[in-house]
From Swiss-Prot:
Record organism: Chlorobaculum tepidum (strain ATCC 49652 / DSM 12025 / NBRC 103806 / TLS) (Chlorobium tepidum)
PANTHER family per the UniProt record, alphabetical: CYTOCHROME C OXIDASE ASSEMBLY PROTEIN COX18, MITOCHONDRIAL (PTHR12428:SF65), OXA1 (PTHR12428)
Homology family: Belongs to the OXA1/ALB3/YidC family. Type 1 subfamily.
Stretches that traverse the bilayer: 5-25, 368-388, 433-453, 483-503, 519-539
UniProt-recorded name of the protein: Membrane protein insertase YidC
Quaternary structure (record): Interacts with the Sec translocase complex via SecD. Specifically interacts with transmembrane segments of nascent integral membrane proteins during membrane integration.
InterPro entries, per database record: Membr_insert_YidC, Membr_insert_YidC_N, YidC/ALB3/OXA1/COX18, YidC/Oxa/ALB_C, YidC_ALB_C, YidC_periplasmic_sf
Subcellular location: Cell inner membrane
An example Gene Ontology biological process: protein transport
Gene Ontology CC annotations of this record: plasma membrane
Record membrane topology: Multi-pass membrane protein
Lineage: Bacteria, Pseudomonadati, Chlorobiota, Chlorobiia, Chlorobiales
Length: 590
């Protein structure tokens, strides 16, 4: 490999490392706002305290909930709804969603898990300030279920509705209806407020998703990096990351929102309104010493002035971050998926990598094979560039003696040296950066594949050969400590990939051979080993196979470049260097 190629690869590796550490796509984070710290309330055994009288308890409820106090007493009843994709548990206390277990996606230990973290109070709630100044959270109120069954099943295109009603008094009521479809992650959520025109202060209520999603992966630190609250309004994505346990993170913005959501690495819970919103509210906290981030994502909805009742419709999506699935919702929910820079890597991910992968998956079920085929296709596309690069490097090699003479002759005149070198490069048909051009062109693709492989659920828990999960490193041994840059494990795929990098350099024509090039021939594979050790195994597999195809391609080109082509190149180089050689002879005569 020539010096330019080595330098190009080294720069690429350096850029990748810096990019991963410091150059993550800028996120529109929530504004920091001062918030009073919440002290944990220690539960005291009931036997240790005297039970309050019924009158005292009623007075406390009335003081807290006002006219809604009567609804805060009741018996909780649950109903379990099962469709083709998940099993959900609804509660009459709050008419809320308490559990949702996916059927086709397991956690890192390959066991079913509940996505909803707020399983005690429930994830969904309506919040508002009553006309008498009471903060009302519907999860504190007992609804009446209109379904007598405790379990329901719906399949295929069938639909099933579960309704709850809360009669506040003779003129006011709240009705909440969930409608499930057998083959969909989408749940229709209908909220009817009857007779509330003068009961809600400010004519506004919030529909909240309370609680971050439970983590599903073994690597909790990595998943924590992907856990955010988000919203889409005004044509842009708002992201709030509660990354610092010492702060409370908030963002409150006005405008028309298409959705609010919370997500972990591979799953998302989103609320999509069907009428214009007043704005959004995001809130996030993280406990010190814990990787889990807790969020609230809320839509702010106005109560139409002059109306006594409102009937609002929402769509809930609680399920995998599958690009095609969330895009089919036509709500721009796919914008929550992190594919890097919108102007560079995201187009590669959305319009090249994912469509090709999805098309190939119709005929090939193993994603390891799909990655290999994809690497082969990319190599075919870059073949002309590689061929031109090889020919250019052979010419560069032939030019080395003359270039050294010119460097010696014009060592005190850099401008003249560059002028002469430029003339020779042009007349010889040489591009001095041709050696690294194919690699530079692939950089956006490689970065986009990094994002796709680490965040797309398509590769999750899909194996290939010894690799159990292509979306994470193929670790075969874990250390009791962590090595800087390398990590706390040994992965096989990066080792094989580094070996192919070495052989690719050995077989690639060098424009010049010096001590620096020899050092880089060993150093660069080591750098790539360190870099890829913590990358998804699928990405290392792609680069491994691309290198193998490159070695085969280079061997073929070395063997098939004809003597006539070599002679023509030599004549072109000789013609380009003739003026420099003539000048040298003329200097000797003097």
């Amino acid at each position: 490999m020539d010096r330019n190629s080595v330098i190009g690869f080294a720069l690429i590796a350096a850029i990748m490392i810096v990019w991963l550490q410091f150059m993550k796509p800028e996120q529109k984070l929530g504004l920091e706002k001062a918030a009073a710290s919440r002290e944990a309330v220690q539960k005291t055994p009931a036997a240790a305290l005297p039970a309050p009288s019924a009158a005292v308890a009623a007075a406390a409820r009335a003081d807290s909930l006002g006219s809604f106090a009567q609804a805060s007493v009741g018996t909780e009843k649950t109903i379990t709804v099962s469709n083709d994709l998940f099993t959900a548990t609804l509660s009459s206390k709050g008419a809320t969603l308490k559990s949702l277990v996916l059927k086709k996606h397991l956690d890192g230990n390959r066991k079913p898990f509940n996505l909803i973290s707020a399983s005690d109070k429930g994830a969904l709630s309506m919040l508002f300030l009553s006309s008498d100044g009471k903060k009302i959270d519907t999860r504190d109120l007992y609804f009446r279920s209109l379904d007598a069954k405790t379990t329901e099943t719906v399949t295929g295109k069938e639909k099933l509705s579960v309704s709850y009603v809360l009669d506040v008094d003779a003129t006011r009521s709240i009705q909440i209806t969930y409608t499930f479809t057998g083959d969909s992650y989408v749940v229709d959520y209908d909220l009817k407020l009857n007779g509330f025109g003068s009961s809600i202060a400010g004519n506004e209520y919030q529909l909240d998703w309370d609680g971050g999603l439970n983590y599903s992966e073994k690597d909790q630190v990595d998943e924590s990096h992907n856990a955010i609250a988000s919203a889409y309004l005004g044509g842009s994505v708002v992201k709030l990351d509660a990354k610092d346990a010492k702060k409370t993170w908030q963002d409150e913005e006005s405008g028309k929102a298409q959705w609010v959501a919370v997500r972990n690495k591979y799953f998302v819970a989103a609320i999509m309104p069907q009428r214009t919103t007043d704005g959004i509210y995001l809130h996030g906290t993280k406990k010190d010493g814990s990787d889990f981030k807790n969020y609230v994502a809320a839509l702010k909805m106005s109560f139409p002035a002059g109306q006594q009742s409102v009937d609002d419709h929402y769509r809930l999506y609680v399920g995998p971050l599958d690009y095609n699935t969330v895009k089919s919702l036509n709500a721009d929910l796919e914008k929550i998926m992190d594919f890097g820079w919108d102007w560079l890597t995201r187009p590669f991910a959305e319009y090249l990598i994912l469509p090709i992968f999805n098309w190939m998956n119709k005929y090939v079920t193993n994603y390891g094979l799909i990655i290999i085929i994809f690497a082969f296709l990319i190599k075919l596309v870059t073949w002309p560039l590689s061929l031109a690069s090889t020919k250019s490097m052979k010419k560069m090699s032939a030019l080395q003696p003359v270039m050294k003479e010119l460097q010696e002759k014009y060592k005190d005149n850099p401008a003249k040296l560059q002028s002469e070198l430029g003339r020779i490069y042009k007349e010889a048909g040489v591009n001095p950066l041709g050696g690294c051009l194919p690699t530079v062109i692939q950089m956006p693709l490689l970065f986009a594949m990094f994002y796709v492989f680490r965040s797309s659920i398509q590769l999750r828990q899909h194996g290939f050969l010894w690799v159990k999960d292509l979306s994470v490193p193929d670790s075969v041994y874990h250390f009791a400590f962590k090595l800087p840059l390398y990590g706390d494990h040994i992965a096989i795929m990066p080792i094989l990939m580094a070996v192919t990098v070495f052989f690719q350099q050995k077989i690639t024509p060098n424009a010049q051979s010096n001590e620096q090039t020899k050092i880089m021939m060993w150093l660069f594979p080591a750098m790539m080993l360190f870099f890829f050790n913590n990358m998804p195994a699928g990405l290392a597999l792609y680069y491994l196979m691309f290198n193998i195809f490159s070695v085969a391609q280079q061997a073929y080109m070395n063997a098939t470049i004809t003597d006539e082509e070599k002679a023509a190149a030599a004549m072109q180089v000789a013609a380009a260097t003739k003026p420099a050689q003539s000048a040298k002879k003329g200097g000797k005569k003097k």
